[in-house]
């Protein structure tokens, strides 16, 4: 038996990282257009016209980072066609009581469909197992199946014994964007000047995302003659976490802002103050899932069975 030990390996919260980067981008002037579907992209002189459900957008440069839909947009402007297959992966998430079962991510030998089923702690103290690797054609096909979850349970036991699967609190699946050429496609399309791809980004896409972002920014800046902002805001205001404070710090916070003393999510210890902050901050939450991704309301053992009505009341009150 042999293994490769990688002490520099680490884990992050993927949606927490994504939201933090988006908030920082917005604070630096990036405009987000949510619920705006791109229906068609047409070349227009030296630029492009994006036809959306909310009108046309004219631009000289496009960065195509549309995940499993990146092939659709690339093929609208380029004769060098690509095809992306959605590769579904099912996961099991275990309660925090199981979080100490392993102290670092345990991978198996990779295969042609990916790195195999892993067992890993999360940054919040849970235990995560998965994923499977099933190729689909449905770009929205993210339903879990009993067969695939059984596969996760079976294969997890190869690398880690006695995983306490009786403590599973939820299961979910996601789609990786697998390009038929088995590689990332990063850069300017040869026959579509100003159209830049970040397509076919699957594992280790999260790890490489910061470097991909810098690389594409440099490419676009070089074409556009752009220079780095002098007043760039490097720091993003974090979300106040009373559970990480000392008793004295928490008491002072609650004295000044009583909403931090009202616990809404008992499983994760999330206060009303944290939920309000998640809604009011830059690119704030507008849904239960939005709150969940920012402050973990509903992510605990009862999976939002207790806190959903209270959170909906706060969302309604804050958003009108």
Regions found by a protein language model. Give the residues of each.
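C-terminal target-recognition/interaction regions appended to catalytic cores
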Residues: 294-297
């Amino acid at each position: 038996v042999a293994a490769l030990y990688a002490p520099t390996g680490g884990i992050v919260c993927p949606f927490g990282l994504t939201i933090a980067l988006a908030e920082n981008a917005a604070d630096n002037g990036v405009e987000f257009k949510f619920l705006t579907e791109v229906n068609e992209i047409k070349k227009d002189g030296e630029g492009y016209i994006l036809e959306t459900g909310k009108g046309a957008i004219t631009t000289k440069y496009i960065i195509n980072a549309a995940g499993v839909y990146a092939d659709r947009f690339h093929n609208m402007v380029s004769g060098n066609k690509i095809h992306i297959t959605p590769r579904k992966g099912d996961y099991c998430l275990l309660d925090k009581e199981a979080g100490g079962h392993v102290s670092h991510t345990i991978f198996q030998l990779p295969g042609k469909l990916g790195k195999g089923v892993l067992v890993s702690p999360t940054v919040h103290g849970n235990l995560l197992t998965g994923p499977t690797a099933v190729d689909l054609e449905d770009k929205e096909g993210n339903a879990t199946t009993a067969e695939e979850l059984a596969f996760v349970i079976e294969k997890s036991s190869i690398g880690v014994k006695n995983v306490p699967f009786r403590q599973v609190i939820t299961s979910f699946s996601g789609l990786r964007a697998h390009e038929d050429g088995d590689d990332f496609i990063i850069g300017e399309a040869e026959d579509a000047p100003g159209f830049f791809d970040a397509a076919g980004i699957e594992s280790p896409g999260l790890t490489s995302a910061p470097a991909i972002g810098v690389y594409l920014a440099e490419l676009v800046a070089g074409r556009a003659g752009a220079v780095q902002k002098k007043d760039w805001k490097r720091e993003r205001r974090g979300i106040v976490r009373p559970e990480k404070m000392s008793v004295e710090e928490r008491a002072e916070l609650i004295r000044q802002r009583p909403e931090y003393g009202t616990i809404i999510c008992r499983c994760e210890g999330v206060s009303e103050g944290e939920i309000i902050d998640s809604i009011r901050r830059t690119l704030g939450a507008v849904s239960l899932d939005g709150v969940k991704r920012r402050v973990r309301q509903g992510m605990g053992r009862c999976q939002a069975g207790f806190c959903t009505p209270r959170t909906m009341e706060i969302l309604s009150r804050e958003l009108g």
